[in-house]
Amino acid sequence: MDYRFGRQYRLLKTDDFSSVFAFRNRRSRDLLQVSRSNGNGLGHPRIGLVVGKKTAKRANERNYMKRVIRDWFRLNKNRLPPQDFVVRVHRKFDRATAKQARAELAQLMFGNPATGCRKQA
C-alpha cells in the first residue's frame, strides 16, 4: 500500500479543474460537494480542493479543512476509480465536526446513491 500524497495525485492547473467542472457530474451533502470526471487515463485518481474565503475567513481554518480532506484521500486513494475529483467545501467544519466531514466525503466519493446524496446536473 502506498500512502503517499505525491504530485501525481493532485490537480494543479486551472485546465485540470475546468475539465472536471465541464463534466457537470456533481454530488453534494451538507458540508461538501464533489465533482468528478469520467476518467483521466492515468490509472490513478487525482484530487483538487476548493475552500473559499466565504467558507472560512481565517487561513488556518481553510488549511485544516484541506488537510482533513487530503488525509482522507491519501488513505483511500487505492479504493477510488482512476478519475479526477474536485472537492468543494460548502460549510465550515472544525475538529468537532471533522468526523462528519470524513463520512460525507466517503459517501460522495464512493458514489452510493442510497446514501441520500443530492445529484446535481
UniProtKB/Swiss-Prot annotation:
It is an enzyme of class 3 (hydrolase). It catalyses: Endonucleolytic cleavage of RNA, removing 5'-extranucleotides from tRNA precursor. Gene3D superfamilies: 3.30.230.10. Pfam families: Ribonuclease_P. Keywords: Endonuclease, Hydrolase, Nuclease, RNA-binding, tRNA processing. GO terms for molecular function: 3'-tRNA processing endoribonuclease activity; ribonuclease P activity; tRNA binding. GO terms for biological process: tRNA 3'-end processing; tRNA 5'-leader removal. Its EC number is 3.1.26.5. It comes from the Bacteria. GO terms for cellular component: ribonuclease P complex. Belongs to the RnpA family. RNaseP catalyzes the removal of the 5'-leader sequence from pre-tRNA to produce the mature 5'-terminus. It can also cleave other RNA substrates such as 4.5S RNA. The protein component plays an auxiliary but essential role in vivo by binding to the 5'-leader sequence and broadening the substrate specificity of the ribozyme. NCBIfam families: rnpA (TIGR00188). Consists of a catalytic RNA component (M1 or rnpB) and a protein subunit. This is Ribonuclease P protein component. It comes from Neisseria meningitidis serogroup B (strain ATCC BAA-335 / MC58). The gene is rnpA.
